[in-house]
Amino acid sequence: MTIGRREFLKTGAAAAAAAWVGGPAVLSAQGKGKVRLAYLQLGWAATEIIHKEDLLGKRGWAAEYSIVPGAPGPLLNQLASKNVDAIDMSFALAAKAFEDGVPLKVTGVATAVLGAIVARKDAGLGKVEDLKGRKIAAIVGTSTFFDIRALTLKGYGFDLQKDTQIVTATSPPDMVTLLGKKEVDAIIAWQPITDSVVFRGEGVYLVKQIDLWRKATGRASGFPVHVCYLVHNEFLQKNPQIAGDLNEAQKDAVDIWYNKPARAMEIVAEVTKLPKDVIQVAHKETVRMLHGLADEQVETLIAQLKINKEFGFLKSDIWDNPDRIRREFFHRA
């Protein structure tokens, strides 16, 4: 499986990637039964607000929440093996897992794309085309790099992998170091890594993934999705109400994110352990927190899948058939 951008966010030892922070928090029994929701520590999807405000418990569930540090792989494995019932996940990796036979459904969305190209402040880069021939640090296996490369190729007609000098990095801190030492002119990364570089004054946003998307697709509205919610098919069949309740919980979390930002950032700091000043910048720079699975959102998601298939990230024939995608990949409450 191609590695997603969140595999490379702040992690401990490899073993810690599969560990669960502090174990699951089991809450008092509720009328609808138990649901186990696990999420990535640095997911940037407002799931931590659902957890800390127990927004599923408030909808009648005995909710068990687990925070998973590091890579998305172990989190997907937890869902596939039915150790948890629902997770947040990169949309591209969700599609890849579906191709690979994981019995899951996308029930809702959580956050728009988080990627960006950040230029070194004194590199003399003013527009995307200026990247030609320049040195760019990137983690080539990530879905963010793949998406930004595909969108640049589609929107600007040049290939970041062939028309620039890609310096392969192993982690976000590696990219930050390369930029700081002036060994590269730009980095291709994602929130909150990009925000921390800009906050420290080492880089400036050259272009955000959302703007590349708008240029490449001609879509002036709608938000391409980075993070979505997945529910295991078996649990969903037995408990179909979880889809709507999870979307409603996310809606409340998004409301807190925008209307009670101090509380939202307090929760994010508690879960992510990131510095508060970085969280403040990242909160401000976040493209859009999302919820639900409205018609317009589904159309945007189908367009994302088409691009991922067109440029080789996805392989299955299902992504050429919007009706099959709606029927087999999505579950709309």
Question: Residue ranges of each PLM-predicted region?
Answer:
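Conserved C-terminal helix/tail region of periplasmic/extracytoplasmic solute-binding proteins
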Residues: 306-333
